[in-house]
C-alpha cells in the first residue's frame, strides 16, 4: 500500500472540531466517528496503564489534586465553581505537593525583569531556585553557521539563544521542576527535549501580544485575520522569505563597517 493511499484511509482524531464533548460525561460512546475513544481505544487503555504505574501515579494524582483545588464555591452561587488561584500560585502548590525543593527557571533575556520578580516569590515560599537566561555563555550566532545578513542587527555581535545550555546547567544542579518563561518558539522545544527534570510553562513568548498568545486566536476573526489566510501558492512562503533574504543581504552590503564614519 502506498504512502498516499495510507494517508487517504487514515482517520484523524480532531477533538477541536467536536460539537458533542461527550468525553466530559459517561456517554463517550455517543461521540463522533473519529472520537479517540472509538478509534484509539487501545492507545488510551495503554496510556491509562502507564498513568497508574508506580512511576507515574504520584505525578498524575497530584496534578489532578492541583486541578481540583483551584476552584471554590461562593456562598451566593453554590452551584457554580469559580477559579481561585493564579498560575504562579498553582506552580508553587504543585511543587509542594510533589515534595520538590529545588526549582529551575529558564527564561528569555528579554523578560529578565519578570524573572527577577518571579525568583523572590519562589524563594519566599521556601524553594531553592536556579535561574538561567537564554543568552548564557554569549555564544555567537556564527557558531550555528549564521552569515552577517541573517542576524537581527547585521554588523553587531549577536549571541545565540542557547536552550541546550540552559537545560544542561539546570541538569547539573539537579533541579526537580523547571519553569519556562518566554523561551522562543523552537528554543522552548529544544529545552523540553533536553531537560532531565519535568517542566512547566509560566508564560509563552508572543512578541506581538505581550506574551499572551491566545489573543491571536481571540482576534483571528477581526484585527488579526491574517492568521486565517490560506496559502494558495505552495511556494508563497518560500518566495516571501527569499525576498526578505535578498533585501537583508543588500542592506548588509550597503551598511558601513561598525565604527566607521560617513
Protein language model features and the residues they cover:
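An N-terminal assembly and electron-transfer interface module characteristic of large anaerobic redox
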Residues: 1-262
Amino acid at each position: 500500500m502506498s504512502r498516499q493511499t495510507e494517508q487517504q484511509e487514515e482517520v484523524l482524531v480532531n477533538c477541536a472540531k467536536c460539537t458533542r464533548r461527550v468525553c466530559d460525561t459517561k456517554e463517550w460512546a455517543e461521540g463522533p466517528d473519529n472520537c479517540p475513544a472509538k478509534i484509539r481505544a487501545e492507545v488510551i487503555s495503554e496510556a491509562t496503564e502507564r498513568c497508574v504505574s508506580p512511576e507515574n501515579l504520584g505525578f498524575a494524582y497530584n496534578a489532578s489534586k492541583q486541578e481540583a483545588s483551584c476552584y471554590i464555591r461562593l456562598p451566593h452561587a453554590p452551584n457554580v465553581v469559580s477559579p481561585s488561584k493564579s498560575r504562579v500560585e498553582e506552580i508553587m502548590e504543585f511543587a509542594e505537593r510533589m515534595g520538590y525543593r529545588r526549582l529551575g527557571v529558564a527564561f528569555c533575556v528579554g523578560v529578565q525583569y519578570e524573572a527577577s520578580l518571579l525568583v523572590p516569590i519562589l524563594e519566599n515560599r521556601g524553594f531553592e531556585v536556579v535561574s538561567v537566561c537564554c543568552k548564557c555563555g554569549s555564544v555567537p550566532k556564527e557558531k550555528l553557521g549564521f552569515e552577517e545578513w541573517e542576524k537581527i542587527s547585521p554588523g553587531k555581535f549577536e549571541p545565540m539563544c542557547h536552550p541546550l545550555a540552559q537545560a544542561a546547567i539546570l541538569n547539573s544542579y539537579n533541579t526537580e521542576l523547571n519553569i519556562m518563561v518566554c523561551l522562543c518558539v523552537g528554543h522552548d522545544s529544544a529545552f523540553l527535549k533536553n531537560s532531565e527534570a519535568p517542566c512547566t510553562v509560566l508564560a509563552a513568548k508572543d512578541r506581538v501580544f505581550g506574551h499572551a498568545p491566545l489573543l491571536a486566536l481571540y482576534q483571528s476573526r477581526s484585527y488579526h485575520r491574517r492568521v486565517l489566510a490560506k496559502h494558495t501558492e505552495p511556494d508563497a512562503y518560500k518566495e516571501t522569505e527569499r525576498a526578505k533574504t535578498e533585501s537583508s543581504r543588500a542592506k548588509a552590503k550597503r551598511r558601513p563597517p561598525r565604527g566607521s564614519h560617513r
